[in-house]
Amino acid sequence: IHKPISGVWEIRLSDVADTRTFDWEQAKKEEPVPPTGATLTVTAIAAEVSVMQQATADQGTGSATHDLWVTNRMGVFTGRLMSNPLGSARRQQLELAEKEQQIFEVEVPPGSPALMARVFGLSDSDADVDLYVFDCTSDECRPARTDADPKGDESVIIWNPSAGKWKIAVDAASLPSETVTYEYLDVVFNSSFGNVGVLDVPQERGQDSRWMAKAHVWSAGAGSHEPGRTPYPAVLLEGWEGSQSFPLSILELVSDRTPSRER
């Protein structure tokens, strides 16, 4: 769960192979399921990265080097920042009406390690807007991931998405007023757009600890992006458990706070 809201979460185990067939009404009942042997590991990690002011840029090549501060906001974990292909982002500020759905299409190039979608910055904090991602790379679109908690900050990351067409749906589940304004973001990461190289090593990161890393951003130029898309430099936060590594989150280096407006 990327960017979970604060509070209590409940985790349920089901013996179905396809979560689309999971009986959510049954899961809401108070009766416990029969005892079943299982092993469940849950890790809550929150880290943020900030770019220090002293960055050097090469205007001729579209590259820049940044010194980064990384802060661990939660419990102890072992991890590091990792290099990541440059992202190609679509940022928009949109208006959504009650019970309306807005659909966005994304073309994922071959070899993309991640596809990310996010809805945030709602004009009404009581509005409930949900996010759905569909894999349309085959003959029919299939549900891939959903973020549908009661709050309006929804985020989904698809690791190693199949190449081809994907669709993202933003759904106005419940709006106190007739409309709500929100910020929309989707990002495809691929080496054809450029690369963000990072120097860091896996270490134990204590609670509230900070560490430094250096990142070098290289961009293939504006011509590598489709119209309406811009470069999205970000690094990968990687966790370690024994000798096994796993992706935790994608952390943006530079935030663009001037999204385009659409009605």
Q: Where do the protein language model's features map onto the residues?
A:
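Surface-exposed, glycine- and small/polar-enriched segments that build interaction surfaces at terminal
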Residues: 126-129, 189-191, 217-222, 230, ...
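Acidic, Ser/Thr/Pro-rich low-complexity intrinsically disordered segments
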Residues: 94-140
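Solvent-exposed, conformationally flexible loop/turn segments
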Residues: 45-74, 89, 97-99, 151, ...
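Short, solvent-exposed loop/turn segments enriched in Ser/Thr/Gly
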Residues: 7-9, 209-212, 220-234
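Long, low-complexity ectodomains and other extracytoplasmic segments of secretory-pathway proteins
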Residues: 21-79, 189-196, 240-263
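Noncatalytic accessory or regulatory domains flanking protease catalytic cores in secreted, cell-surface
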Residues: 1-22, 132-184, 209-210
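Non-cytosolic beta-sheet module surface loops
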Residues: 3, 15, 108-110, 119-124, ...
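Surface-exposed binding patches on compact interaction domains or structured appendages
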Residues: 37, 77-81, 85-105, 124, ...
